[in-house]
C-alpha cells in the first residue's frame, strides 16, 4: 500500500528532491528492485488484447514471466544492472493490513459476480490479482537462468532494497511504495519497471533532500508516514496530509502529538486508535529485519541459454525466435554494462551538512517562485 499522501507532500514542499529522467540516465547503475511489487504490476499490465492474462496452452498464467523477461531486458539494454529482492515473511504488525486486503478481495469477488458490463468485469478481475508462491518461484527460476541476481529478504523487500543501497551495493532502491523512503534509501526510483509504451519518466527521489527540504529528522519523517497511514497500523482518524505535516513540525514526535490531542477537548475531531502500536511501527522502519548489506555479494552471470529455451519455450510455450533474440540482447547488454559510469571510478563522498542546507534552501526558494530546479548528477 505504501504511505498515503506522501508523494503529494514531497511534490508540493520539496519539488527539487524529485528528478524525472529517461531510463538512459541510469546507464552503469546497479539497482535493487522490489520483485513482489514488480510481479504484481506485470500480472495486471501484461495482458492479451481482450484484457485477459497471458496463458500458455495448458492455461497456466505467463504474464509475470513475460513481464519479468522483457522489462529486465529493457533495463539491461540501457546499461542498468538489476537485482531483485523478494518479500520474506510479513511482520506480525502487518496482519491487520492483510486482513483488510482479504476483506476487500471478498467484496471485489461479490462485485465481479454482479457485474454485467465487460469493462466492469475486467476492472474487478484486475483488483483480484494476487502474487502467489508459484509466481515468485517461477520468477526466481527465470532470473537464475538469465544470470540476474536475486535475494529473498527476511521480511519486507523494500527494507532490504534500501539496505543494499545504504551499503553501496546498489545505487538505488526501485519500488512504487513510498514507504521505501522511511528505510532511508539514498535514492528511490519509481516507474523503473513500467512498460516503455507508457512513456512515463523514471522518478528519482533523493531522501536526504526530502528530509532537509521538510526540515525533519528521519525519526520525524517516519512518524509523519505513520500518521499519513502505512501498512503496519491505522492512522489518526481525521488527520490528513496538511494537518499531519503541521503537527509533526510543531510537536516533533507522535508522543507529543498524542499528548496535545488528549489535552484539549477541542481536538476531539481527531481519533487516536485504541492500543495504537505506533511505536512498534516506528521500530519496523528504523530497525528493519534485513540481511546486512555488507554480507551480500551480487553477481551477474552469463545466461543459461539452453535452460532459458527449455523453460520459456519448451515449458511455457514462448516464441523460440523471440526468446533467442532476447538472450542475445541479454549477453550484449551485460557486456556493455560492465563499462560502468565515469563517477564509478571515484569514491562517493556523503553530502555535508552545508551542502544539504544549501539544497534545502534552494528547494524552498523553488517552491516560492513556482519553479522546480533539477539537481545535477
Swiss-Prot record:
PTM remark: Phosphorylated. Phosphorylation upon DNA damage induces relocalization to the nuclear plasma.
Spans annotated as N-domain: 1-105
EC number: 3.1.-.-
A single GO BP: DNA replication, removal of RNA primer
Residues spanning the signal sequence: none
Disordered: region residues: 99-119
Subunit structure: Interacts with PCNA. Three molecules of FEN1 bind to one PCNA trimer with each molecule binding to one PCNA monomer. PCNA stimulates the nuclease activity without altering cleavage specificity.
Protein name according to UniProt: Flap endonuclease 1
Species the sequence originates in: Vanderwaltozyma polyspora (strain ATCC 22028 / DSM 70294 / BCRC 21397 / CBS 2163 / NBRC 10782 / NRRL Y-8283 / UCD 57-17) (Kluyveromyces polysporus)
Species classification: Eukaryota, Fungi, Dikarya, Ascomycota, Saccharomycotina
Amino acid at each position: 500500500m505504501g504511505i498515503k499522501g506522501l508523494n503529494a507532500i514531497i511534490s508540493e514542499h520539496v519539488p527539487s528532491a524529485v528528478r524525472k529522467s529517461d531510463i538512459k540516465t541510469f546507464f552503469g547503475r546497479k539497482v535493487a528492485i522490489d520483485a513482489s511489487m514488480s510481479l504484481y504490476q506485470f500480472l495486471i499490465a501484461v495482458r492479451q488484447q481482450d484484457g485477459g492474462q497471458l496463458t500458455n496452452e495448458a492455461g497456466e498464467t505467463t504474464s509475470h514471466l513475460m513481464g519479468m523477461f522483457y522489462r529486465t531486458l529493457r533495463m539491461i539494454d540501457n546499461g542498468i544492472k538489476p537485482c531483485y529482492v523478494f518479500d520474506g515473511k510479513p511482520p506480525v504488525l502487518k496482519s491487520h493490513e492483510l486482513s483488510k486486503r482479504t476483506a476487500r478481495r471478498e467484496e471485489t469477488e461479490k462485485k465481479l459476480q454482479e457485474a454485467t458490463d465487460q469493462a466492469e468485469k475486467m476492472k474487478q478481475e484486475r483488483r483480484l490479482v494476487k502474487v502467489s508462491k508459484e509466481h515468485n518461484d517461477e520468477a526466481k527460476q527465470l532470473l537464475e537462468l538469465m544470470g540476474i541476481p536475486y535475494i529473498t529478504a527476511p521480511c519486507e523487500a523494500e527494507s532490504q532494497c534500501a539496505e543494499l543501497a545504504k551499503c553501496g551495493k546498489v545505487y538505488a532502491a526501485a519500488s512504487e511504495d513510498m514507504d521505501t523512503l522511511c528505510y532511508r534509501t539514498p535514492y528511490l526510483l519509481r516507474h523503473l519497471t513500467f512498460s516503455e509504451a507508457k512513456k512515463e519518466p523514471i522518478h528519482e527521489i533523493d531522501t536526504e533532500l526530502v528530509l532537509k527540504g521538510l526540515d525533519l529528522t528521519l525519526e520525524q519523517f517516519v512518524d509523519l508516514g505513520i500518521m499519513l497511514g502505512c501498512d503496519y497500523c491505522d492512522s489518526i482518524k481525521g488527520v490528513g496530509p496538511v494537518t499531519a505535516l503541521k503537527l509533526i513540525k510543531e510537536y516533533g514526535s507522535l508522543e507529543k502529538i498524542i499528548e496535545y490531542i488528549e489535552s484539549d477537548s477541542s481536538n476531539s475531531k481527531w481519533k487516536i486508535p485504541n492500543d495504537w502500536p505506533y511505536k512498534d511501527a516506528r521500530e519496523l522502519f528504523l530497525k528493519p529485519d534485513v540481511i546486512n548489506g555488507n554480507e551480500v555479494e551480487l553477481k551477474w552471470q552469463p545466461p543459461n541459454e539452453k535452460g532459458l529455451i527449455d523453460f520459456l519455450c519448451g515449458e511455457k510455450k514462448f516464441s523460440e525466435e523471440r526468446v533467442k533474440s532476447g538472450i542475445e540482447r541479454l549477453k550484449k547488454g551485460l557486456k556493455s554494462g560492465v563499462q560502468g559510469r565515469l563517477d564509478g571510478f571515484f569514491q562517493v563522498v556523503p553530502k555535508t551538512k552545508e551542502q544539504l542546507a544549501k539544497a534545502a534552501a534552494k528547494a524552498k526558494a523553488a517552491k516560492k517562485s513556482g519553479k522546480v530546479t533539477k539537481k545535477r548528477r
